[in-house]
A protein has these predicted regions:
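Helical "lid/coupling" subdomains associated with nucleotide-phosphate turnover
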Residues: 22, 26-55, 67-115, 132-133, ...
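Short beta-strand-to-turn element immediately C-terminal to the catalytic PLP-Schiff-base lysine
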Residues: 2-4, 129-132
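N-terminal glycine-rich anion-binding loops that anchor highly charged ligand groups
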Residues: 9-25
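N-terminal basic/disordered segments at the start of proteins
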Residues: 1-11
């Protein structure tokens, strides 16, 4: 994402590029980034580097997250990136990843409630934040980085129709992994008392929102800032799990690139909502990249 600073803390996007590369494909089993996955990432980053040079970018920051944190050859991958594209990427810790995602989507947490839950579902990990509203904005009280993202869960569930029992087991596993965070802060009691708003930033929640709105093709302007209630999450997650790969791929809000991963993302969303059943969920088509841009605009 390439942007120009406007007045105040705002920015205007002037160029961007996004491609699914599945860098963590096979990582859970092998402990290493696969050569083919690195090749896909390098090809995408070469496009990014070309855009950066063309636009004469004055300030740049590129980050790597869970796949490079976990892989024994993560440093080798980053060295290749620098040698072949000229881009210097830094591996960031889960806490910084969580904070950057929050910075990018916090403006949408606007219901005036005292507590918040934010989650960011990625390919290799899922960050879940427990937040407190303060005079200056939202403060991260605690968080957990689950070593589960859509790539690893998709490898477990497979690309075709997902059996009800397998899907339910994935949802239960995710909900269970959030138990310690819940217990540390009594989050469930705050949710039951109606004192918590929730926001999700990921391709999964935006896809579910697009489907819920009946969009034939994805429309960021309509999806970003929209709402999903739990009944919608459950209904459309079940429909996606019951569909085969081709059925998912034909939907304009899913497409062939994500057809084998979207059910894994649905399981993550449902697991979080099973642990904390808020009345509705805010949808953000923004997050980590926007958080990085805001940091660059603030300067060192």
């Amino acid at each position: 994402m390439i942007a120009r600073a406007d007045d105040g803390a705002a920015f205007r996007v002037v160029d961007g590029f996004s491609r699914i590369v599945r860098l963590g494909e096979g990582l859970e089993a092998s402990g290493a980034l696969a050569p083919a996955a690195m090749d896909r990432a390098l090809a995408a980053l070469a496009v990014c580097a070309s855009k950066i040079r063309k636009r004469g970018v004055a300030a740049f920051r590129g980050v790597a997250t869970e796949a490079c944190r976990r892989a024994r050859n993560g440093a080798e991958c980053l060295a290749r990136v620098r040698a072949e594209t000229g881009l210097a990427l830094e591996v960031i810790a889960p806490a910084e990843e969580a904070d950057l995602a929050l910075a990018g989507c916090a403006p949408l947490l606007d219901r005036g409630l005292p507590h918040g839950i934010a989650f960011d579902i990625g390919g290799g990990s899922t960050e879940v934040l427990w937040l407190a509203r303060e005079a200056g904005g939202w403060r991260r009280v605690d968080f957990v980085s689950l070593p589960l993202g859509v790539v690893a869960i998709a490898e477990r569930l497979g690309a075709g129709r997902v059996a009800d029992a397998d899907y339910a087991a994935a949802v239960s596993d995710i909900a269970d992994r959030l138990g310690e965070l819940d217990a540390r802060h009594g989050i469930a009691a705050h949710v039951a008392g109606g004192r918590v708003e929730m926001i999700g930033t990921s391709g999964t929640v935006t896809t579910l929102s697009g489907i819920a709105m009946g969009l034939d093709r994805y429309d960021r302007a309509r999806v970003d800032g929209s709402w999903l209630d739990l009944a919608q999450v459950r209904r459309f997650s079940a429909e996606l799990a019951a569909a085969d790969f081709d059925g998912r791929a034909r939907h304009g809000c899913v497409g062939p690139e994500r057809a084998d991963m979207v059910v894994a993302g649905c399981a993550l969303v449902e697991g979080i909502c099973a642990r904390w059943p808020v009345d509705r969920l805010r949808v953000a088509d923004r997050g980590l990249r926007e958080g990085i841009l805001m940091g660059l605009m603030r300067g060192p």
